[in-house]
Design a protein with these regions (language model features):
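Hydrophobic alpha-helical membrane context
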Residues: 14-15, 105
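Boundary at the C-terminal end of the N-terminal hydrophobic targeting segment
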Residues: 16-20
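Sec-dependent N-terminal signal peptides
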Residues: 4-14
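Short, extreme N-terminal leader segments that mark the start of a protein/domain
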Residues: 22-33
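Generic detection of long, well-ordered alpha-helical segments
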Residues: 30-31, 43, 49-50, 110, ...
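Domain-level detector of nuclease and nuclease-like folds
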Residues: 74-199
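Short, His- and charge-rich active-site/binding loops that engage polyanionic ligands
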Residues: 31-90
Length: 199
């Protein structure tokens, strides 16, 4: 009888673990992850990136994103497709897919949920995208080091992901040593990207 109880307890534990019920106590406030194209500080408790750094260096465009989808990484608790389902939040790349279209391997890395933020669809497809395009013009002349910092509101989705309140992108020009920073509220933009500059 005692053996049967032990077996049942073990099966219950394994079942709960498979469903993720035991993951919550081990979630990290911040974990640093280095890839070959970006370094990200990710909050598993918020299910969002909190800071990300990448270099933009005039890479040739050799591949298209096609039907690539975001994917979860092993060993990290991130957001997932449910957080973006039927709402105003886009899966916003922090390190842009178009900047790393020089190889299929690099492009795929940009589709990790570690590189994905809950971003207002009008911001993601509007002024944020236009600033990314401008970065790729600037990096024709000199390499850029781009740092993105994410701030958060108190809003949490029913799916448990925290909503960012703003995104600050600082672009360092490595030759001229100039830095330009832009802060965007996570809402529908009401002005040109240039007007979001804060320094």
């Amino acid at each position: 009888m005692r053996r049967l109880v032990s077996i049942l307890l073990a099966l219950t534990y394994l079942s709960c673990t498979a469903q993720g019920d035991f993951n919550t106590p081990n979630l990290r406030e911040s974990v640093k992850v280095e890839t070959s194209i970006y370094t990200v500080w990710y909050s598993e408790t918020k299910e969002q990136p909190i800071r990300l750094v990448y270099k933009s260096s005039n890479r040739p465009k050799n591949v298209d994103r096609g039907s690539m989808n975001f994917y979860k990484e092993n060993n990290y608790h991130t957001s997932d497709n449910a957080d973006y389902y039927r709402n105003v939040w886009d899966k916003g790349h922090l390190a842009p897919a178009a900047t790393f279209s020089d190889s299929n391997q690099n492009l795929k890395k940009t589709f990790s949920y570690l590189n994905c933020a809950l971003q207002n669809q009008y911001l993601n497809r509007g002024q944020w995208r236009l600033l990314e395009e401008q970065e790729r013009k600037w990096d024709d002349e000199q390499e850029l080091v781009v740092t993105i910092t994410v701030k958060f509101s108190d809003s949490i989705l029913p799916t448990k992901a925290n909503l960012p309140s703003s995104f600050t992108k600082c672009i360092k020009f490595t030759v001229s040593n100039e830095t330009r920073c832009y802060t965007f509220p996570n809402s529908r933009p009401d002005k040109d990207w240039r007007e979001y500059r804060v320094n």
